[in-house]
Amino acid sequence: MSGSFTESFADDGKLLLCVAENGHSFEFQCSETTSVESVMRFVESVSGIALSDQLLLSLDMKLEPQKLLSAFGLPASDREVFVFNKAMLQSNSHPPSPEDVDLQDVADALPPASLHEHHPLDDASDPALKALPLYERQFRYHFHKGRTIYNCTVVKHENCERLTREQKVQQRAVEVATRNLEQYYRVIYQNFLEFMKRYKHQHRLHSDLLMNFGRDIEKLRSAKIHPYLQTESRKCLLDFVKEDNLKKAVENCASSHRQFENKIAQFQQMFVEVKRKVEELFACRASLSMKNLEVTVKDHERFIDEEKSIMQSLSKDVNTVKKLVDDCMSSQVSSSLRPHDAVSALGPMYEVHDKNHLPKMQACYNSISELLDFCKNKKNEMNNFVHGYMQKITYVTYIIKDAKLQFPVFREAMVRQDDLFADLKLVRGVGPAYRACLAEVVRRKASMKLYMGMAGQLAEKLAMKRETEVRKREEFLKTHGPFVPRDVLASMGLYDTPTQCDVNVAPYDTSLLNIEISDVDRYAPEFLVGLHSKIASLKSSLTMSGDSSLSAEPEEIGIDTFDKDNFDDILAASELIEIAGTSKMEVENAKLKADLASAISRICSLGPQFEYEVLDESEVENVLKNAADKTAEALQAKDEYEKHLLLMLKEKQMHCDSYEKRIRELEQRLSDEYLQGQRHNNKDVSGLNLMHEKVSEYKAEASSDVEGNKTHVSGSEPMDEVSCVSNLTSKQPCKAREGMDENMVDSSQVLSQPLDSSMLESQQNNEKGGKDSEAGEMGVFLSNSSTAESPQKSLDDNVATGRGLDAKDSGDIILELRNELMEKSNKLSEMESKLNGAMEEVSNLSRELETNQKLLEESQMNCAHLENCLHEAREEAQTHLCAADRRASQYTALRASAVKMRGLFERFRSSVCAGSGIADFADSLRTLAQALANSVNENEDDGTTEFRKCIRVLADKVSFLSKHREELLEKCQNLEATSEQTRKDLEEKKELVKTLYTKHQLGKQANKEKISFGRLEVHEIAAFVLNQAGHYEAINRNCPNYYLSSESEALFTDHLPSRPTYIVGQIVHIERQIVKLPSQLSASASPEAGKTHHLCSDQGSRTLASSSISTSTSATTTSNPYGLSSGCEYFIVTIAMLPDTAIHQQAS
C-alpha cells in the first residue's frame, strides 16, 4: 500500500482509489479475491471517511461491500475506483474547507548572512586582498539565496501540479457520477415512454368507447340475428348484453377516465420537471474545464528552467572567486592575474548578481507564487463545485426514484381501468364476434367439403392399388396353377384375395348453421366490426396478404395450400388431383370460400387490437408495401388463371364444333345412301323401311349418348353429396382409348370423365370380332363420337358399294342387309344380358349401401359420445378457470401487500440512513415507530402489524443500547483516568525500585571491592552517583563535595549511548578548590586571569595525561558549576578505569 499518485496506472495487482471530495488518490495492493469491504477499510484508514459513508463507483457499476473485486472486473490497469462521501452528499452537510498549502517563504528559508566572519585575508595590508574574502562571502550568499529561491519555486510548482492533478481526478469523478445518473435516468425515462405509449393506446381506446357508446348500442339494436337463432328474449345483437346496467357503467367509466387522465397529466408534468432538472444539471457541467489550467501550469515550467540556468551561473561564479581566494592564500597568484585585476573583474560579476540574476529569480518565484494562488483558488472552486454538484445529483436521483416508485401504482391503475371498461369493451366486441362466428360456420362447411373430397380421393387410389394386386395374383395362378394341385395352393393360402378398403369419414359438424358466404354480410354487416379509418384503408391489403397462400400455377393446386385446414399431415407432398364426383372448379371455390371466411374472422379478431395500435410511419409504409406486393402477385396469378380458363374453353368449343360437324357429315352420308338404295331397289319396300327405322334408332341413340356425355360433364353432383364409401370395380382406361380419335383422347385426358359402358363394350366387340357390318360401325361412331381408322374404311367401302348398286342385283343387297340386321339383333340380346349383369351389380351396391348406413349410425353414436366427453372437458376447464381466478385474486392481494411492505421498508431504510450517529439513529427509529403507531388501519394485514411491532421493539432496544453505550463510554473514561493514575504511580515505583537497586548494587560493590566511603585518597576506589544537577558526586560519609572531573566523565561516558547512574574507578588525582566571593570573582575576570586559568587547565590536562598521582591544591576558581555557597570547599577527582569496567557501569 502507498499513498502516492501515478498518472499512468498500469501495474497489475494495484487498484487506484480516487476520493471525489478532495481529489486525493491512493494505490491499494490487492488481487481479484480481495473483498470490496477490505478496500473500504483501507479508504477509511487513509482518508478518514467512515465505512458506512463510502460509495464506491467504477465506470457505471456500484461496488457492493459483500462481493469480491473479480465480480466487477477489478483490479484492471485502465480502470479506477472513485470514492464518494455520503455524508457530504446530504443537503445539510457543511461546505468543504478552503485548500491550505503550508510552505516556507524565501525570507524564512534564507541562511544568516556570514558577512562578518573572520578570514585570514581580512588582516592583509593590500586593500585588494582584503576585498577578496568579502566578495567570496557575498557570492556565496548570492548562491545560497538563489538556491533557496529555486527550491521554494520547485516546491510551489509541484504543489501546482498536485492541485491540477487533484482537479482532474475530481473532474473524472464528476463524469463518472454524471454517467451513472444519466444511465439511471435513461432507464427510467425509457420506462416512462413505454408507459405513456401503453397509456395513450388505452386512452384512445377508452375515449372511443365512451364517445361512440351510443353508436355501438344502435348498431347492435339494428343488427337482427339469424332467424334460426332468434328466441323470445333474443331478437337482435343488443339482447346479448344487459342494457340496463350499461348506463351506470358508462357514467362510472367517464368519471374514472377523467380522474385518471388528470393523474396522468400530473405524472407527466413531474417527468417534465425531472427532465428539466436533469438537463440543467448536465448543462452546468459544461463550465468544468481544465485545459487552460493545465496549459498554464505547463507553461510556467520555463521559469524553473530559467532559475536552473541562473543557479548554474551563480555556482560557477562562486567557484571562481573561491579559487582566487585559495590562490591568494597559497601565494600562487600568477603574474598575469594580480589581486587588483581579480577585484576589478569580480565587480561587474557582483553587479550582474545583484541587479540581474537575483531579481530575475525573484520574479520567477513571484510568478510561480501567483500561479500557486491561482491553482488554490481553482481548487477551492472545484471543491465547492463538486460539493454542490454531487448534492444536486443526490437531489435529482431522489426525485427520479420518487417518480420510479409511482410506476407500479399507475400500472395497477391502468389494470383497474381495463377492468372498469370491460362492459364497454363487451358491447364493442359483440358485433365483430358475431360476424366472426358466422364466418367460422362458412369456413367449417367448406373445410368439411374439402375433407370429404380428399377421403374419396384416398379411397379411389386404394381401390386402384387393390385391382392391380388382384391382376398380379390371377396372372400368377394362371401361370403356375396347372403344375401344382389346387389343394396344395389352397393350403399355401395362394387363393386369397385382397379385401375391399372402406374409407369411412364419420359425419361431423352436422349442427352447423345453414348459411353461405353471402349470408355473412346479410346477417352480420361489415359496419358491426366498426373498423377504424386506418383499418379500413388497410383492409384490402390484409385480405390479399391473407389470400397470398394461393398457388401461382392454377393447374397444380398443391395440398399444402390447405395448411390451415390441417390437410398437410395427410398428404403433405402430393398434388391435388380430381376427386370422384367433383370438378376442379368446385374444389377451387370451396377453398376460396374457406380462405375468405378465415380472412373475415381474422379481421374481426384483429380489429380491436390493431385499431389503436401506435405505428410509426416506416412501419405503416412497410405494411402497405408488403400488402401491395402481395396484392399485385395475387392479381397476376388471377389474370394468368383467367387466361388459362379462356384457352381451355376455346379448345373445348373447337372440339365440340368438330364433333358436331362430323356428326352432320355422317348423317348426310347415311341419308345419301338411303336415297340411293331407295332408287335402285323399289321391290323390297318393307326391308328398306325396317332399315330406315334402325338408322333413325341409331341416330337417336347416338344423339342421346352425346347429350348424356355433355350432361355428365356439366351437371356433376355437388361435393357435399359425394359418397363417403367407395367400392370401385376394375377399369381399363388403356383399352377404352384404343379406338378413339386423337382429339377425343386429348379431351378425355383433360376432362377425366368415364366412358359409357355401351361405348366400352362396343369397342371391345370390334377388337375381338374383326370386321363388323356397315350399320354397326356407324352405330359405334355415333355412340363413341370418335373416328377410328377401321370404321372409316368401312364407310369408304359402303360408299363404293352404293355406287355399284346400279350394275348389281338389288335382291342380293336386300339379303345382305337382312343378314346384318340379324347380327345386330343378336348383339342387342347380348347387350340385354350385360344390362342384367349391371342390375345385379347395382343390387350388390345397394347391399353395401345398407352396410354403410349401419356404419353411419355407429359413427353418430360415436359423435354423441365425443360430445359428452367434450361437455365433461368444458366443465373441467371451467373448474380450472375458477381456480385460476382465485389464484389471481390471491396474487393481487399478495402484490398489494408486497407493495405496502416495500413502502414500509423504504421508510425504514431512509430512517436508518438518515442519521450520522447512534443518537440520530435511535431518534429516527423512535420517530418511525411513533409514525407507524399513529397510522394504524383496521384493514391492514398481519404482516404490517408484525412489522410495526418489530419496529417498535427495535426502537426500544436501540434506545436501550444507546443509553447503555453512553454509560459504557463514561465508565471507559473513568477507567482510563484511573489507569493513567496507576501508570504514573507505577512509574514512580519503578524509579524508586531502580534507585534502591542502585544503592544495593553500590553496597555490594563496596563490600566486594572495598570502596572507600571515608576520606578519599589517591589509589583508593571511589563511587560517584549522578545527582539531580547532572554531576557525578562521590559517596563519602565524612566530607562531601567530591565531584568527578569532566575528563574522567568523558572517559567513562563517550562510548555509551546514555549516561550511567553511577561510576566506580580508582583515584589518580584530587584537586581542592574554594568558591570565591562575588567581589573576588569580578576582580579575577581579567584577561590575565583568563590566561592563568587557561594555563592551569592545560597544566591539569598534562597532569592527567601523565597519570600524575600527586594531589594539587588551587586556592582560587573562576566559576561555581556545582551551585555551592561562597567560600565553600569542594574537590575535583580524576579517576581511572578498573580492569573490569563492565561490572561497574550500568546505563540508566
Swiss-Prot record:
MF term (GO), any: protein homodimerization activity
Motif segment (AIM (Atg8-family-interacting motif)): 567-570, 1130-1133
Keyword annotations: Autophagy, Coiled coil, Cytoplasmic vesicle, Phosphoprotein, Protein transport, Stress response, Transport
Coiled-coil region(s): 816-868, 956-996
Protein name: Autophagy-related protein 11
Region Disordered, annotated ranges: 699-727, 754-777, 784-803
InterPro entries xrefs: ATG11, Atg11_C, ATG17-like_dom, Ubiquitin-like_domsf
Amino acid composition bias (Polar residues), ranges on this chain: 754-767, 784-793
Assembly: Homodimer. Interacts with ATG8E, ATG13A and ATG101. Binds to ATG8E on autophagic vesicles.
Organism: Arabidopsis thaliana
Gene Ontology cellular-component annotations: autophagosome; cytoplasmic vesicle; plasmodesma
SUPFAM superfamilies assigned to the protein according to its UniProt record, in alphabetical order: Ubiquitin-like
Localization: Cytoplasmic vesicle, Autophagosome
Modified sites of kind Phosphothreonine: T851
Function: Accessory protein involved in autophagy. Acts as a scaffold protein of the ATG1-ATG13 complex for faithful delivery of autophagic vesicles to the vacuole. Involved in the stress-induced phosphorylation of ATG1A for turnover of ATG1-ATG13 complex and proper ATG1-ATG13 complex assembly or activity. Required for selective mitophagy. Required for senescence-induced breakdown of mitochondria-resident proteins and mitochondrial vesicles. Seems not essential for ATG8-mediated autophagy.
Biased composition (Basic and acidic residues): 699-710
Cysteines engaged in disulfide bonds, as pairs: none
